[in-house]
């Protein structure tokens, strides 16, 4: 399946009963559930590796005919109908009459009884009646999408977004589809073009320009240069004439959607964020030193002059940066600062961008910590933070410490500093790690401006110096090959040095052999030798999603090994089952839930009558019961991309490293992957791929003017 969940490959059987020949289907099938029956339109082609396959251009669902097929359709397509309820429906109406009778009057579900004559729970009945009405609308929409060459798997999302009037909405302005996450401009454009919209239609051009800017943001850019925008729009829209594009951009500027500033094109919202954040940070950088509290070192706590220097800076300056390499003492410095500030009766807030990072901060410092979103009291119903300039954090705190600050995007940093008030703020991070997932590079821009007081710790402490993980990470950071064996490390560092055997390199050359080695390491060798639980303690981190050693392939293989058997399927489309390890792919701020992007969980069990799943999160500290629909935002997580692992650490980490990833390999990517390991890291793959990554020291450039805005404020 592709990253946007649109493209997928399925193995299908022909015929209404599924008893015909097997065929490989490729195309916009990412939202299709296993066991679905489809009518597909497309062409047969011959693939050089996979042979003959059917390339699906569009499809629609076909209703099943058999009793088993109807029951399966009910459980996979209608929320609230579990296996017991589905079987009772088929027995009551007969397989050949279920759709006819329920389309006519879904209230007839109230007549259904179990095989023993018991009534179906009222809650399940009400949910199923409401769901049937929605599904009926979805089936009508599938026909509409099919006629316009769009995969019918999107229908459910569109109905949830636009309601019963969805066909009228899409006919009136197909480009409204781009409002939905993970549905691209090209899908909307296919509908629009099939409805007769011209290439140079003004609505089309404006939607295309918006999409190019949004895609740039997803790559971390706050803006695009005009030339970059024109080139991206030309490729997307297939319009070579600049004049209509300039007219469309002018319209977006007049409508307040876009800001053009010195050849830089921003979405207005991002321009406002960057400008506001620049002013807030600039004011802190220019502020005269003022003592927040008196401080004396605690003689019972060992602290270096550099570490105590951080305490002195934070005590007197409203914004301080603490950066440093692994093992340099950033965490110990935070502990010293918190202990000193609390002795002075300061109110201290510890926070981090992710829940995993906040828990790690809590465990390492011994003090409570929370996500930045929780600290700022994000309200999902209002889509805004309750803490702001009118209700600042300084009403409750004197000092704010933010860990993993390299993950701060423009949006999150803007919200934080808009609400900081008179608090002194310490940002702690490692600028050599990957930049944030969202637009901007706040910590790197602050460092580059050289306007904000910064302490960069480099010394390696004795306990950390024993770790080959830390020694190798430091070598990677400086462009040198990591120690590929403990013997090599001892030879380089001195034969009598004490070292922990916590970093290994396993040489493999072909992608398939790398994959096999990863499976053996995760499932057998690491548990047997080191005692780690392969389900709970070992994480595989990969550079990219596709390929034989990509995220999808490894997750499928590891699911078979680590969650075998016929455990109950919870969400058919994604293959999530009871026992699966899963990861949240977008922030969920639902009251009493709050699961952040990147949080890992286990599916403990599934109630098919209530259509709810019970999850274990926070390393077993928390359990949640969620509707199965909420699991649409989760993916299997025996393996994660390195990017998604930011802010997290795991007891044991396995990193496949292949030249098959060559376009993605870089020094920051390898450095970030290695530093996710707490006790054991195994790098598996090709030495040449490691060398290639080390040679790419620079991260991909991001368009940001935050440092420039800071410098401008310094001269005001």
Mark where each language-model region is.
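Structural detector for short beta-strands of small beta-barrel domains
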Residues: 1-8, 42, 600-604
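Beta-strand/loop nucleic-acid-binding surfaces
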Residues: 9-33
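Accessory alpha-helical DNA-binding modules that contact the DNA backbone or grooves
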Residues: 33, 48-263, 319, 323, ...
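Flexible glycine-rich surface loops and low-complexity tracts that mediate binding to linear polymers
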Residues: 35-50, 652-655
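Pre-P-loop entry segment of helicase/translocase ATPase cores
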Residues: 202-206, 214-218, 253-312
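Conserved helicase motor core of P-loop NTPases
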Residues: 288, 310, 330, 432-592, ...
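ASCE P-loop NTPase helicase motor core
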Residues: 311, 320-493, 688
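C-terminal accessory regions
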Residues: 478, 599-716
């Amino acid at each position: 399946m592709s990253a946007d969940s649109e493209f997928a490959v399925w193995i299908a059987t022909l015929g209404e009963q599924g008893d015909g020949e097997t065929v490989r289907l490729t195309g916009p099938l990412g939202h299709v559930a296993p066991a679905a029956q489809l009518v597909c339109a497309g062409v047969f082609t011959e693939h050089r590796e996979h042979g003959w396959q059917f390339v699906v251009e569009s499809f629609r669902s076909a209703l099943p005919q058999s009793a088993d097929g109807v029951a399966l359709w009910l459980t996979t397509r209608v929320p609230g109908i579990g296996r017991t309820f589905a079987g009772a429906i088929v027995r009551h109406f007969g397989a050949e009459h279920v759709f006819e009778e329920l389309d006519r009057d879904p209230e007839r579900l109230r007549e259904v009884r179990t095989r023993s004559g018991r009534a179906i729970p009222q809650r399940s009945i009400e949910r199923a009646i409401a769901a049937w009405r929605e599904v009926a609308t979805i089936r009508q929409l599938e026909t509409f999408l099919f006629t316009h060459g769009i995969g019918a798997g999107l229908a459910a999302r569109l109905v949830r977004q636009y309601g019963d009037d969805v066909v009228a909405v899409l006919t009136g302005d197909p480009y409204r589809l781009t409002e939905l996450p993970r549905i691209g401009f090209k899908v909307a454009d296919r509908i629009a073009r099939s409805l007769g919209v011209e290439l140079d239609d003004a609505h089309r051009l404006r939607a295309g320009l918006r999409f190019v800017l949004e895609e740039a943001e997803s790559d971390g850019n706050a803006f695009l240069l005009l030339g970059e925008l024109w080139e991206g729009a030309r490729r997307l829209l297939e319009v070579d004439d600049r004049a209509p594009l300039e007219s469309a951009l002018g319209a977006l500027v007049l409508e307040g959607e876009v800001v053009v500033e010195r050849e830089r094109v921003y979405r207005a919202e991002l321009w406002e964020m960057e400008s506001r954040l620049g002013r807030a940070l600039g004011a802190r950088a220019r502020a005269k030193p003022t003592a927040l509290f008196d401080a004396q070192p605690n003689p019972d706590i060992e602290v270096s002059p550099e570490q105590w220097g951080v305490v002195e800076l934070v005590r007197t300056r409203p914004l301080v940066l603490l950066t440093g390499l692994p093992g340099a003492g950033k965490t110990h410095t935070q502990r010293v600062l918190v202990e000193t500030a609390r002795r002075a009766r300061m109110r201290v807030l510890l926070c981090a961008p992710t829940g995993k990072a906040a828990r790690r901060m809590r465990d390492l410092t011994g003090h409570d910590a929370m996500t930045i979103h929780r600290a700022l009291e994000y309200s999902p119903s209002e889509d805004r933070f309750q803490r702001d300039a009118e209700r600042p954090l300084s009403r409750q705190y004197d000092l704010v410490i933010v860990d993993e600050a390299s993950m701060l995007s423009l949006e999150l940093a803007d919200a934080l500093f808009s609400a900081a008030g008179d608090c002194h703020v310490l940002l702690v991070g490692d600028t050599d790690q990957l930049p944030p997932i969202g637009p901007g590079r706040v910590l790197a821009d602050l460092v580059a401006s050289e306007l904000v007081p910064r302490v960069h710790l480099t010394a390696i402490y004795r306990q950390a110096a024993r770790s080959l993980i830390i020694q190798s990470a430091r070598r990677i950071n400086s462009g040198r090959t990591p120690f590929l064996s403990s013997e090599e490390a001892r030879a380089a560092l001195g034969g009598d040095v004490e070292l922990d055997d916590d970093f290994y390199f396993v040489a493999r050359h072909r992608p398939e052999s790398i994959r096999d080695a990863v499976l053996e390491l995760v499932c057998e060798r690491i548990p047997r030798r080191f005692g780690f639980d392969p389900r709970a303690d070992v994480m595989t981190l990969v550079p990219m999603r596709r390929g034989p050693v990509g995220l999808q392939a490894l997750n499928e293989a590891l699911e078979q090994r680590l969650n075998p058997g016929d455990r109950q399927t919870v969400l058919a489309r994604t293959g999530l089952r009871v026992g699966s390890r899963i990861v949240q792919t977008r922030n969920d701020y639902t009251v009493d839930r709050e699961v952040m992007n990147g949080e890992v969980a286990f599916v403990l069990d599934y109630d098919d009558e209530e259509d709810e799943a019970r999850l274990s999160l926070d390393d077993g500290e928390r359990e949640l019961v969620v509707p199965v629909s909420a699991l649409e935002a989760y993916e299997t997580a025996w393996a994660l991309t390195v990017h998604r692992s930011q802010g997290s650490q795991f007891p044991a980490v396995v990193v496949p490293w292949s030249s098959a990833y060559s376009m993605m390999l870089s020094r920051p990517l390898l450095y970030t992957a290695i530093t996710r390991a707490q006790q054991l890291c195994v790098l598996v793959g090709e030495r040449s791929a490691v060398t290639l990554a080390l040679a790419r020291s620079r991260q991909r450039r991001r368009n940001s003017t935050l440092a420039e805005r800071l410098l401008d404020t310094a001269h005001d």
